[in-house]
A protein has these predicted regions:
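A glycine- and small/hydrophobic-rich beta-loop-beta segment
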Residues: 63, 71-135
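Short, well-ordered coil/turn residues at beta-beta hairpins
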Residues: 20-21, 100, 175
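Glycine-rich phosphate/nucleotide-binding loop
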Residues: 106-207, 212-243
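Solvent-exposed alpha-helices and their adjacent loops that cap or buttress functional pockets
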Residues: 8-12, 66-68, 89-91, 138-140, ...
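Internal gly/pro-rich beta-alpha loop/helix module
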Residues: 1-6
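Flexible, glycine/charged-enriched surface loops at secondary-structure junctions
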Residues: 9-14, 60, 223-231
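Glycine-rich phosphate/diphosphate-binding loop of Rossmann-like nucleotide-binding domains
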Residues: 13-79, 91
Length: 243
């Protein structure tokens, strides 16, 4: 059973937890940007639950309208690159990394210096990939316990398990977006997967789901079972293991 909200649970006492939350923004011109519907509510709820469980918590946040939980250190960023830099800065000494942010996968190669005018019927934007923050942390040595999120519109389990294995995560929390779930909503439902197991967290308020997720993370962290960071690096860069 979940501990009541606000209880003095110490499941994460003495641990440093680093969380990303919210969306990122990638500038097109001075007045336009590419972003997504993430409200940051789930990431902030996880931060609150981890703090209530006794952890030292740092949250690296994209632009959101969510209050910072008491006792949580907040680092505000805007772009995926800024989020990556902030995560790198706070990663040393981190025991658990939880990637709850909805990070832009692409960014404009050359943002316009001035507002783009309507001069034609179409507009082509050259885009480049942003750094994969989750994969980068998963390949770090020494490596924290790495938890990813998978927000999917279809084939949730298949896509989540593919991400779990492909990025060699310790755990992934998956949910289907839409139908008043996940993005910009107060409720959520998650299926949590790890190598060899899973746990359902049924639909409830995000704070309750977050408390359940933190409980599962603490249980798995306590087992001492970890996925190898060396393998994660070799997956991202074939031949790395031979260096």
């Amino acid at each position: 059973a979940l501990a009541p909200r606000g209880s003095a649970s110490a499941a994460m006492a003495g641990l440093k937890v680093l969380i990303t939350a919210g969306p990122t923004r990638e500038r097109i011109d001075p007045v336009r940007f590419i972003t997504n519907r993430s409200s940051g509510k789930m990431g902030y709820a996880v931060a609150e639950a981890a703090r209530a469980a006794g952890a030292e918590v740092v949250i690296v946040s994209g632009p959101v309208n969510v209050a910072t939980p008491a006792g949580v250190q907040r680092v505000d960023v805007e772009t995926a690159e800024q989020m990556m830099d902030a995560v790198r800065a706070h990663l040393p000494g981190t025991d658990i990394f939880i990637a709850a942010a909805a990070v832009s996968d692409y960014r404009p190669v050359q943002p316009a210096a001035e507002k783009i005018k309507k001069t034609s019927d179409s507009l082509m934007l050259a885009m480049s990939r942003t750094t994969d923050i989750l994969a980068t942390v998963a390949a770090t040595e020494p490596r924290p316990f790495v938890v990813g999120f998978a927000a999917e519109t279809q084939n949730v389990e298949r896509n989540a398990l593919g991400k779990l294995a492909g990025k060699r995560l310790d755990m992934i929390a998956a949910n289907e977006v839409g139908d008043r779930l996940a993005f910009d909503c107060d409720d959520n439902a998650l299926t949590v997967y790890w190598p060899g197991g899973k746990r359902e967290l049924p639909r409830a308020a995000k704070r309750e789901v977050a408390a359940g997720l933190v409980e599962v993370i603490a249980e798995r962290f306590a087992t001492g079972e970890r996925v190898s960071a060396v393998a994660a690096e070799s997956d991202r860069n074939p031949g790395a293991a031979a260096r």
